[in-house]
């Protein structure tokens, strides 16, 4: 299973942003390489397809709203850490995003081919996918780290990566 001494951070605020990552699980992979799994948690039970890239409709705050697809959201959090967290860059920490919609029973819309590009970067798991979610976590985290990777990420300096700076 998932190691008992795996690091866990709940509602982690990405420094110098208003973004919060619902769940981060840390450890190392089979090659002892530091890794983190980002899990975007959604309570949604239903979503509707839109023609817009990375956008779904769901019932939120008393009405139907257009919101980011959770896979896209999880991937953007991973990209923020990869692009601006010095420790993630220098220690080459692997960031593996996914989304878990624990109340959703029908996957037709959330896993629709319209969102394929985002699902490939960060898979979405629904209520019946708990075993697949566990397998995803175990695939990336074979050994626990007693929170060491999360501690390193949290105390890291924030600066643009060379890759990002080269693009600008």
Which positions does each model-derived feature cover?
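Conserved adenine-nucleotide phosphate-binding loops and their immediately adjacent elements
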Residues: 159-168
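Accessory nucleic-acid engagement/destabilization modules that flank
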Residues: 1-156
């Amino acid at each position: 299973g998932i190691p008992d001494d795996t690091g866990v951070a709940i509602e982690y605020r990405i420094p110098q942003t208003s973004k919060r990552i619902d769940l981060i699980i840390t450890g190392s992979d089979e090659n002892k390489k530091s890794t983190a799994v980002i899990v975007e948690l959604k309570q949604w039970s239903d979503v509707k397809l839109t023609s817009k890239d990375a956008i779904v409709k769901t019932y939120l705050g008393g009405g139907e709203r257009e919101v980011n697809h959770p896979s896209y959201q999880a991937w953007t959090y991973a990209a923020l850490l990869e692009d601006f967290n010095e420790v993630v860059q220098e220690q080459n920490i692997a960031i593996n995003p996914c989304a878990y919609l624990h109340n959703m029973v029908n996957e037709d819309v959330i896993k629709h081919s319209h969102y394929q590009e985002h699902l490939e970067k960060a898979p979405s798991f629904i209520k019946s996918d708990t075993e697949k979610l566990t397998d995803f976590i175990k695939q990336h985290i074979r050994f626990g780290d007693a929170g060491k990777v999360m501690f390193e990420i949290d105390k890291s300096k924030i600066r643009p990566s060379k890759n990002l700076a080269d693009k600008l």
